[in-house]
């Protein structure tokens, strides 16, 4: 087992139970073309290979790339790309490998310190959704972040990340993975979530406007919505809009559901 590197936030998953849960959550079949981010020692890769049509694995650590190539290089349905998933242009990289595209699923144990950028890489943003979208994304991540992603309104964990992610995907909390399932154990527990990208029946008329409202609305959780949005909407106008939606004008951002955020954004767009 290679020595984990702190600068890459490496923690080797060693729980067969967790692997089983990840595999089950991914709903894999032999027609799937999978992207694995940060395969590390290859423990998940080895489980995925017999279950899918192909795997594109992206690994930043050069030493691990050498090990992965040695372990899986003989599999003709395995492609290893060395690089940073955040800056890598997968479309360009895969132009000469048509048999590995289009990727339809993502399965990954992602580093805690780049969770939000990876989510944006995979899903896009409210203002700029990822097109074409993946069919399904299964991620092992920090438990606290996973809880924030799937959180419901009026809960402590509910915030801008919840609204933004749930706008772009159905978010399912699959299971928790204790720190002892890793070597070395991280300081916090992890969780597996499944994201199913989707298009809402009633989307935002102006996604950029909704993105801005959510960002400003959650800027200070202790403040009421009219205080957080005063730079773009005066209090009287906001009160009138909320009244039309039958929402308490003293509301805070975390009290609004995704649907209410969309209705609020759309109403603001139509009357502006």
Curated annotation (Swiss-Prot):
S-adenosyl-L-methionine binds at residues 11, 13, 38, 59, 84, 109. The keyword Signal does not apply. Keywords: Cytoplasm, Methyltransferase, RNA-binding, rRNA processing, S-adenosyl-L-methionine, Transferase. SUPFAM superfamilies: S-adenosyl-L-methionine-dependent methyltransferases (SSF53335). It is an enzyme of class 2 (transferase). Signal peptide: none annotated. It comes from the Bacteria. Its EC number is 2.1.1.182. It is found in: Cytoplasm. GO terms for cellular component: cytosol. GO terms for molecular function: 16S rRNA (adenine(1518)-N(6)/adenine(1519)-N(6))-dimethyltransferase activity; RNA binding. Pfam families: RrnaAD. It catalyses: adenosine(1518)/adenosine(1519) in 16S rRNA + 4 S-adenosyl-L-methionine = N(6)-dimethyladenosine(1518)/N(6)-dimethyladenosine(1519) in 16S rRNA + 4 S-adenosyl-L-homocysteine + 4 H(+). The keyword Transmembrane does not apply. InterPro entries: KsgA/Erm, rRNA_Ade_diMease-like_C, rRNA_Ade_Mease_Trfase_CS, rRNA_Ade_methylase_Trfase_N, rRNA_adenine_dimethylase, SAM-dependent_MTases_sf. Specifically dimethylates two adjacent adenosines (A1518 and A1519) in the loop of a conserved hairpin near the 3'-end of 16S rRNA in the 30S particle. May play a critical role in biogenesis of 30S subunits. Belongs to the class I-like SAM-binding methyltransferase superfamily. rRNA adenine N(6)-methyltransferase family. RsmA subfamily. PANTHER family: DIMETHYLADENOSINE TRANSFERASE, DIMETHYLADENOSINE TRANSFERASE-RELATED. This is Ribosomal RNA small subunit methyltransferase A. The lineage of its organism: Bacteria, Bacillati, Cyanobacteriota, Cyanophyceae, Oscillatoriophycideae. The gene is rsmA.
């Amino acid at each position: 087992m290679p020595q984990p590197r702190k600068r890459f936030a490496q923690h080797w998953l060693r729980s067969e139970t967790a692997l089983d849960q990840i595999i089950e959550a991914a709903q894999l079949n032999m027609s799937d073309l999978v992207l694995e981010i940060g395969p590390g020692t290859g423990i998940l890769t080895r489980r995925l290979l017999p279950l899918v049509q192909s795997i594109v694995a992206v690994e930043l650590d050069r030493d691990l790339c050498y090990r992965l190539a040695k372990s899986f290089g003989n599999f003709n349905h395995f492609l290893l790309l060395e690089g940073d998933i955040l800056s890598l242009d997968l479309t360009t990289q895969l132009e000469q490998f048509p048999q590995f595209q289009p990727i339809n699923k993502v399965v990954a144990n992602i580093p805690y310190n780049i969770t939000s950028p990876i989510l944006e890489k995979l899903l896009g943003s409210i203002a700029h959704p990822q097109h074409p979208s993946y069919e399904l994304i299964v991620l092992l991540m920090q438990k606290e972040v996973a809880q924030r992603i799937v959180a419901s309104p009026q809960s402590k964990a509910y915030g801008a990340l919840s609204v933004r992610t749930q706008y772009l995907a159905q978010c399912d909390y699959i299971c928790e993975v204790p720190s002892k399932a890793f070597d070395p154990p991280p300081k916090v527990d992890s969780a597996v979530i499944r994201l199913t990208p989707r298009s809402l029946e009633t989307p935002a008329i102006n996604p950029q406007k909704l993105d801005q409202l959510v960002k400003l609305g959650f800027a200070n959780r202790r403040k009421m919505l009219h205080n957080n949005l005063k730079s773009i909407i005066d209090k009287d106008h906001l009160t009138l809009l909320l009244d039309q939606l039958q929402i308490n004008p003293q509301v805070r951002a975390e009290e609004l559901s995704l649907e209410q955020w969309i209705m609020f954004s759309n109403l603001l767009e139509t009357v502006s």
